[in-house]
A protein has these predicted regions:
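Acidic, Ser/Thr/Gly/Pro-rich intrinsically disordered interaction regions
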Residues: 1-35, 50-227
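Extended, well-ordered alpha-helical segments in internal regulatory regions
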Residues: 39-53
């Protein structure tokens, strides 16, 4: 596998999510694609480690199969790499949005689908603890029927949304939200975490996966060099 090409495909999927947001059907489709590519990148890290440590694993490559082969071959460097990777992975997923992504990936692995996608409105310029409000838009085969229907529903919900968010903004001396500063986007819930914005989560995660790849390669070289 060429990890760089897979990362590029992942970034293309992110662009497609942004392009079709807030259509739940297409966002779900491209987010599913994004997560599949993300999982391939993780597998690619172990493919490179397998090649460099000479374990000669067969696909599909998992952490468990990597560990078992490393133990059979008594390859201390490979075992050390896996221990390092698990710690590094946990560190990279401590922050909220990488943690959400990890939970979404685990959900998909377990249930073979993504959590349900919903359309919500939010302030275009976000501040901490701003509210989001779900809107019910007519769908056809889970797709938005028209932008006009979306706009009508946003306008219908706008007065209540603006009243609530601006009450919070006033209390915190934050800028007032105007009518033209509202956008619709796709969100989902995962475990006890509510209203996770899909575009933002996917965007935040790209640097995380790139760091994992870069630092894994450095760690592999260090272990081999110091052998």
């Amino acid at each position: 596998m060429n990890i760089e090409e897979t990362i590029e495909k992942c970034e293309i999927s992110l662009k497609q999510i942004k392009q079709y947001d807030p259509d739940p059907f297409y966002v779900n489709h491209f987010f599913e694609q994004y997560i599949s590519l993300r999982d391939k990148i993780i597998e690619g890290i172990f493919e490179e480690a397998d090649r460099d440590f000479g374990l000669f694993l067969t696909k599909p490559m998992t952490e468990e199969s990597f560990l078992q082969k490393a133990k059979i071959k008594n390859d201390e460097n490979a075992i050390k790499f896996l221990e390092w990777f698990r710690i590094k992975y946990a560190e990279e997923h401590k922050n909220p949005y990488p943690n959400f992504m990890n939970k979404i990936c685990n959900f998909r692995k377990k249930f073979e689908k993504l959590p349900d996608v919903k359309i919500m409105i939010r302030a275009s310029d976000r501040y901490k603890d701003d509210i989001n409000q779900e809107i019910q838009v007519p769908l056809s085969n889970k797709k938005l029927r028209s932008k006009n229907e979306l706009d009508i529903e946003i306008k219908r919900q706008l007065p209540v949304f603006l009243e609530i968010i601006n009450h919070k903004r006033r209390d915190r001396n934050e800028p007032k939200v105007a009518n033209n500063q509202i956008i619709a986007s796709t969100f989902l819930d995962i475990e006890n975490h509510k209203d996770i914005e899909i575009v933002y989560t996917a965007e935040i995660y790209i640097p995380v996966i790139k760091r994992l790849v870069e630092e894994a390669r450095i760690k592999i070289k260090d272990l081999i060099r110091n052998n």
